[in-house]
Amino acid sequence: MKIPSHRQLAIQYNVNRVTIIKSIELLEAEGFIYTKVGSGTYVNDYLNEAHITNKWSEMMLWSSQQRSQYTVQLINKIETDDSYIHISKGELGISLMPHIQLKKAMSNTASHIEDLSFGYNNGYGYIKLRDIIVERMSKQGINVGRENVMITSGALHAIQLLSIGFLGQDAIIISNTPSYIHSTNVFEQLNFRHIDVPYNQINEIDTIIDRFINFKNKAIYIEPRFNNPTGRSLTNEQKKNIITYSERHNIPIIEDDIFRDIFFSDPTPSIKTYDKLGKVIHISSFSKTIAPAIRIGWIVASEKIIEQLADVRMQIDYGSSILSQMVVYEMLKNKSYDKHLVKLRYVLKDKRDFMLNILNNLFKDIAHWEVPSGGYFVWLVFKIDIDIKYLFYELLSKEKILINPGYIYGSKEKSIRLSFAFESNENIKHALYKIYTYVKKV
């Protein structure tokens, strides 16, 4: 917007022209107006609200981080609304979280908090927590040292760090599908090329790798146990085969093992257990066993990789919360975490069986599923032709039931991720009956 001339302003406000000139010089110095030689003086556009909004929208289009799928955005918005039934939610219900153990661990942490430095932490994480993770990994057949462990703010944060600090731009990621990683844009932000391998065809990895043999920058991403969303696990033979592929083609493996501690029968070894050449980068987390808000996970890798990631980390966020790390350490040290796990496995197995019983009664003629031996999820695949997107919106808008449709995980099947971990048995039963009713209508 152009402002009037000095003479017009002096007449309008009944002041001397010198006053107008000084005022304009001051406003120009502050950036509120600007002068075009031979044209006049103008108000800066950034004071215009519509211009600001349009400019921000334009700048967001330049972002290297893509927006989530619309369905995922909607799920993320509603997931914290307690008025909905969250039959697909990927976290523990409040009653399953170790409240008493957490309180005790926090109290123990607080008792020596004056000895704690509240300065910036290093990129590696709390030494005592790293050491106790090393001990626990050793009991699983993974022999590493403190220098091989880095604490992160959860598993997804670990994957983000690896994407930035290890893989680099334009990498090829060979990953199992369906996978929760498809509901994020963690690999897409650096223009990674995503090659999907169906979880039930994991032995096809070798053939797929051969197609990209000339591409140097590539990695395998795999969830070996209780895959999110299907609940499936690899056999020990499949794990060994993946290691063989990795060694043959000199390709690193990113092993996302966040459900490792939630097993309902004898635990199986991780892929890292078979790793003799340091090809496997192992990721895990306490978010699925303690609480998401604790935001503590870890990476196990070669010393050189950990050193590189720690340096990148210091450029981004200076490390995870030292208080959260100390609380988790206290739970591990006093064994309350392991006692909690025993109870958690028992309760989750019971809730899984409750859900499976209802599925057998209602869905056996119209859908199929597998029995997970751990984790949170049952993968419901419909035998009939049904519009899953329509079902999602109908249940959301009319019944306040939130489901996670399979397509957000890269599945082409007519599928839903069901969770027995978050809701009460009463709500699980109610939600499944409503889903059945709407499916029959469709």
UniProtKB/Swiss-Prot annotation:
Q: Does the keyword Thylakoid apply?
A: no
Q: Name one Pfam family in it.
A: Aminotran_1_2
An example of a GO molecular function for this protein is: transaminase activity
* InterPro entries, alphabetized: Aminotransferase_I/II_large (IPR004839), Class-I_PLP-dep_aminotransf (IPR050859), PyrdxlP-dep_Trfase (IPR015424), PyrdxlP-dep_Trfase_major (IPR015421), PyrdxlP-dep_Trfase_small (IPR015422), Tscrpt_reg_HTH_GntR (IPR000524), WH-like_DNA-bd_sf (IPR036388), WH_DNA-bd_sf (IPR036390)
Required cofactor(s)? pyridoxal 5'-phosphate
Gene Ontology biological process terms, A to Z:
alpha-amino acid metabolic process; biosynthetic process
Recorded hits in Gene3D superfamilies, A to Z, give: Aspartate Aminotransferase, domain 1, Type I PLP-dependent aspartate aminotransferase-like (Major domain), Winged helix-like DNA-binding domain superfamily/Winged helix DNA-binding domain
Which of UniProt's keywords are assigned here? Activator, Aminotransferase, DNA-binding, Pyridoxal phosphate, Repressor, Transcription, Transcription regulation, Transferase
Q: What does this protein do?
A: Positively regulates the expression of the NorB efflux pump and negatively regulates the expression of the AbcA efflux pump. Binds specifically to the promoters of norA, norB and norC and abcA genes. Overexpression of norG leads to an increase in the level of resistance to quinolones, associated with a threefold increase in norB transcripts. Disruption of norG leads to an increase in the level of resistance to methicillin, cefotaxime, penicillin G, and nafcillin, associated with a threefold increase in abcA transcripts. Could also have an aminotransferase activity.
Family listed:
In the C-terminal section; belongs to the class-I pyridoxal-phosphate-dependent aminotransferase family.
Q: What is the name of this protein?
A: HTH-type transcriptional regulator NorG
